[in-house]
């Protein structure tokens, strides 16, 4: 089943296979103007909700593989997770500025990223404290709104409007982080330590 909505192409696939992860140096660029004329994207408010009060955005396509990478303290890096063949679409991007790792310069730091099955979500485990790192989910290709969400909101488009990146807490709540939309079908939020991060919207 394929859904088309403007700039969004929604597809479903049950195939699984190897995914590709690419690591590259970040390249700075100017912010996209929002509807208010500001060069900085607007942010959603930070709030905490019971996990039972949100819908997590489902993901089709072949998911990225889990991966472990070695970061170097003092060096800026971008880690890109891609869906598997055939499309190799970007699934998520983790950005670590040169000052983000709280470790002596030159220290090797292990980072493990595991993709949560069937949804736009990752489990992050970094062996050093991070400050200023960010996570971006890119969902244009394999967006799948939960059926109940579409029934409530009337369309996948309406559900998408309220999406944010959240961090799952051990007490059964989700912290919806201040989330930006740097581009269409992209959500960006700060990484608040190790844990599970998902794209979700309130019920």
What feature does the model see in each segment?
Residues 12-22:
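Sec-dependent N-terminal signal peptides
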Residues 187-203:
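C-terminal beta-strand-rich structural cap/linker in extracellular carbohydrate-active enzymes
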Residues 26-28:
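C-terminal motif of bacterial Sec signal peptides marking the signal peptidase cleavage site
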Residues 30-33:
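Bacterial signal peptide processing site
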Residues 73-107:
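Predominantly extracellular/luminal regions of secreted and cell-surface proteins
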Residues 1-13:
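N-terminal secretory signal peptides that target proteins for export/translocation
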């Amino acid at each position: 089943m394929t859904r088309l909505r403007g700039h969004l192409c929604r597809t479903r696939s049950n195939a699984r296979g190897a995914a590709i992860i690419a690591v590259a140096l970040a390249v700075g660029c100017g912010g996209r103007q929002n509807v208010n004329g500001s060069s900085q994207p607007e942010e959603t408010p930070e709030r905490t909700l019971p996990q039972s009060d949100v819908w997590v955005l489902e993901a089709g396509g072949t998911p990225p593989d889990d991966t472990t990478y070695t970061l170097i303290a003092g060096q800026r890096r971008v880690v890109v997770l891609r869906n598997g063949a055939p499309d190799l679409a970007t699934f998520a991007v983790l950005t670590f500025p040169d000052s983000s790792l709280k470790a002596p310069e030159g220290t090797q730091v292990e980072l493990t990223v595991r993709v949560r099955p069937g949804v736009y979500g990752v489990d992050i485990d970094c062996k050093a404290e991070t400050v200023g790192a960010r996570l971006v989910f890119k969902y244009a290709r394999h967006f799948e709104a939960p059926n109940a969400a579409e029934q409530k909101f009337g369309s996948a488009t309406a559900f998408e409007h309220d999406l944010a990146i959240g961090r799952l807490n051990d007490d059964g709540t989700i912290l919806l982080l201040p989330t930006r939309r740097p581009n269409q079908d992209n959500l960006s939020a700060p990484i608040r330590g190790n844990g599970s991060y998902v794209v979700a919207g309130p019920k």
